[in-house]
Regions:
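An alpha-helical, amphipathic repeat domain used for nucleic-acid recognition
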Residues: 1-209
Length: 209
């Protein structure tokens, strides 16, 4: 397999385009070019071509993995899933995740703690935080440690109710605010306590459900 051309300028992702005699193209990172000693006119044996394809696939998965973890907090499972969804080979996706883990660039425990801190900052209740951990594919055995110091949300709930109700006793307005709090993952008990602190009627409000 002959290399017809190898562009000298990379694209915006840092990849160089290599054209082969059969009309196919490969997008290569500089490291792969140097590892294989590639240049225009080089004749590749079938074995070399096979190894080149494997190296291109491996490097593609690794570089995409780096971009993903640089832009978002992801778990290992979430990262692997995203890589496959983006078209990376499943085996190479797993290898890329292991590679980042070995470099300590992805850590499910640290990611879980970051997610929980973000949930607290957004005023979410504990159950909503658990839902986010599930959605991010954080292993369940890490949940309790991440949630261990979840603060009491009564004051935040009360602040939310003050802002939404503005002193109104309108049952419909109260229900709307309470429904919003439930969607945020706050328990009936926590909401009831906040209602009591604001001297709002809780007679028909369940303590838990």
């Amino acid at each position: 397999m002959r290399i017809e051309y190898l562009k000298t300028a990379p694209d915006r992702m840092g990849r160089y385009t290599l054209g082969l005699e059969d009309g196919s193209k490969l997008l290569l990172y500089r490291q792969t070019i140097e590892d294989f000693g590639l240049y225009t006119g080089l004749e590749l044996t079938q074995e070399q071509y096979k190894r080149l394809l494997a190296a291109v696939s491996e490097m593609s998965a690794k570089m995409r993995a780096v971009r993903i973890v640089s832009a978002a907090n992801v778990s290992k499972k979430d990262l692997e899933n995203r890589l496959v969804q983006k078209g990376e080979d499943p085996a190479q996706a797993r290898k890329a995740v292991s590679w980042l883990s070995e470099l300590h660039l992805i850590d499910d425990s640290a990611t879980a703690e970051t997610i929980v801190r973000a949930c607290i900052a957004k005023g979410y209740g504990r159950s909503r935080a658990r839902q986010v951990l599930y959605e991010k594919r954080i292993p369940r055995e890490l949940w309790e440690a991440a949630l261990e110091d979840y603060p009491d949300q009564t004051e935040k709930i009360a602040d939310f109710l003050r802002a939404k109700l503005k002193g109104s006793q309108d049952p419909k307005l109260q229900k709307k605010a309470i429904d919003a709090l439930l969607r945020r993952g706050h328990s009936y008990g926590a909401i009831r306590q906040a209602l009591s602190e604001l001297s709002l009627d809780t007679d028909d409000f369940p303590e838990e459900e």
